[in-house]
Amino acid sequence: MRIEKDKELMNILKIMAPGTPLREGLENILRAKTGGLLILGDSDQILKLVDGGFKINSEYSPSYVYELAKMDGSIVLSSDLKKILCANAQLIPDSSIPTFETGTRHRTADRVAKQTGAIVIAISQRRNIITVYKGGIKYVLRDSSIILARANQALQTLEKYVAVLDRVVNNLNILEFKDIATLFDVVTAVQRSEMVMRIVSEIERYICELGNEGRLIDMQLSELIKSVEEDGILLIRDYCRSNMEYEDIYKQIQGLSSEELLNLDGLSKIIGYTGVPLVDTLISPRGYRMINKIPRIPSNVIENLVANFNQLKCVMEASYEQLDNVEGIGEARAKAIKNGLRRLREQIMLDKV
């Protein structure tokens, strides 16, 4: 459900993450301080720009790439990264393509990437950095230790944000069962949920860039967030105006800037409440989020329940017979729903104490 930002960049980072044969070859060139220019792709459009060099047509290996980079020209790899096609080749892109790069190697890489849409990697001999180009994208690969430090810092921040979200949601749970939740409580929970998901997106990018070195970070992340996004979406479904699509609302919230996300009035407008006081407006949940917490209740049954009763309070007050009349709910499921909601309420009230 998250909008896939920088999807192309994420795919590039996966290809050359630490632990991959390509990254190993790049690191070898970097350590040797020879510099290098690699193009990933063997389409006719790319091969038309290749002039001279040696036809290698050999299986890819990090050590082969390292040895071939000692020559001045560029190295052309196949699209699947399984073969080295040629080495010591000269790339001749269209010189009218604008570029703001300075070094010859980087100017060529930028132009070839813009002209062909292929991934081109320039390794600087003096600055000792790896720069990746694709279309209009330019990205400097960072050392794993730097990314790891940033990922750990982001995890610590996430931990604090999740703790605040838990407090806000637990408070909302109590208010929902008492049917005294206000627009302020709801919008605060939506805001906090989105804040957490933004940090998660940042950590996921670090994990992608770390490759096999990011496994522990990934495990810690999974443990921390569990069902945060799902609960956030159900929260929107519980409280948005009935004539609005919850998916569109979720996308709108994701599109907000950091400053806009801090504006609770703006968030309340997005979920359909315009010109009403946040603290004084009482709203009742439909029950999607709470009923979802009851085990073994299918989503179609939850949809039918909400369509029939429209409010969590009405579901809780309904008799076994009234629940039984809902499509997909028999006597056993009616008991499971009643008992499940009762246990949930008791648990939430105990947590408060």
Swiss-Prot record:
Q: Which UniProt keywords apply?
A: ATP-binding, DNA damage, DNA repair, DNA-binding, Magnesium, Nucleotide-binding, Nucleotidyltransferase, Transferase
Write down the EC number.
2.7.7.85
Binding-site list for ATP: 73, 91, 104-108
Q: Name the enzyme group at the top EC level.
A: transferase
Q: Which InterPro entries match?
A: DisA, DisA_sf, DNA_integrity_DisA_N_sf, DNA_integrity_scan_DisA_link, DNA_integrity_scan_DisA_N, DNA_integrity_scanning_protein, RuvA_2-like
Q: Which reaction does it catalyse?
A: 2 ATP = 3',3'-c-di-AMP + 2 diphosphate
Q: Which domain of life is it from?
A: Bacteria
One GO biological process term is: DNA repair
- Keyword Cytoplasm set for record: no
The Gene Ontology terms for molecular function here are:
adenylate cyclase activity; ATP binding; diadenylate cyclase activity; DNA binding
- Domain DAC residue range list: 6-144
Q: Which family does it belong to?
A: Belongs to the DisA family.
Give the quaternary structure.
Homooctamer.
Q: What is this protein called?
A: DNA integrity scanning protein DisA
- Species in which this protein is naturally found: Clostridium botulinum (strain Kyoto / Type A2)
Source organism phylogeny: Bacteria, Bacillati, Bacillota, Clostridia, Eubacteriales
